[in-house]
From Swiss-Prot:
It catalyses: uridine(54) in tRNA + S-adenosyl-L-methionine = 5-methyluridine(54) in tRNA + S-adenosyl-L-homocysteine + H(+); uridine(341) in tmRNA + S-adenosyl-L-methionine = 5-methyluridine(341) in tmRNA + S-adenosyl-L-homocysteine + H(+). PANTHER family: TRNA/TMRNA (URACIL-C(5))-METHYLTRANSFERASE, TRNA_TMRNA (URACIL-C(5))-METHYLTRANSFERASE. S-adenosyl-L-methionine binds at residues 168, 197, 202, 218, 278. The lineage of its organism: Bacteria, Pseudomonadati, Campylobacterota, Epsilonproteobacteria, Campylobacterales. The keyword Ion transport does not apply. Keywords: Methyltransferase, S-adenosyl-L-methionine, Transferase, tRNA processing. The active site is at residues 303, 337. This is tRNA/tmRNA (uracil-C(5))-methyltransferase.
Amino acid sequence: MHFEEKIALNKALFSSLYDKEIQCFKSPLKAYRTRAEFCIYHHENGEISYAMYENKKKIPIKNFEIADEKIQAYMPILLDNLNENLKHKLFGVEFLATKIDLSITLLYHKNIESITQDLQELSKKLNLKLIARSRGKKLVFNGENLKQILNIKNKEIFYEFNNDCFIQPNTTINEKMIEWVIDLLEKEERKDLLELYCGYGNFTIALAKYFNKILATEISKKNIEFALKNCDLNSIKNISFTRLSSEELSQALKKEREFNRLKGIDLDGFNISHVLVDPPRAGLDVSVIELIKKYENIIYISCNPITLRENLEILSQSHEILNLAFFDQFANTSHLECGVHLRLKA
């Protein structure tokens, strides 16, 4: 789907809720995707190829121009080596790239411990962070954590995460989304931030300097570990990360229940002026909307315009939509990322 067509369709989707100017951010058309997942096609001659599904059928592919340049460079090299001695029962390959790093995961329908030596040699030969998975087993060679550097407002922000974390798959657009949020914040009075679905701190770390304090929640223990590490990487001291669901956070804020995970965090000490949410495709459930709608400013990052539209039907009863932005996360597809800025009605 062309960019202009995608924008027109989504403008129409939100037209009854928002009739002001919409900011639109385009993606590069090639080499933008930092995560690429392929199935494996086993040819009759014994060779393998990367493949993708179309109409439930595996279609072999030779290249993938929308993938990050590091992924494109490694694809043929890796395939040649897999064809030598590591293709048996291989059913998938996953690539994850950052500006400065790359990891590759091989998926097998067999006991991977039997090929440990071959995998080790492949990792050394190609200088790769290599992960192998089969049912209930995982082997890691040369580490699995990736380092990333984002350039936000001419400042470098440092991150570390692994393949199990949710990662924005278009680095260029990710930087633009973070800067869009900062542009909004710079025009407003700011106190403390509450962030839900914070992940490994993608937004949190970059926004730390714009608030007195931040309370950030996430249900994944591994994400919280990386978020704390990313605070250290950037010498940030004003963020409190805690592993709570939105329901648990609501109970804690209402003093209905105490949590050991909040030990050392004084919830009464936060003066929250802004809430940031970046939920999964299902959007916000009613309990989360009830939790956040009492706050003056809401910034909502969405990967699903349909569920965003449904949530805004409710939120717009208490809040005014001040800004709406479209981010072309996946160029030439129907997918669109959205950002919304809402303020409590007088």
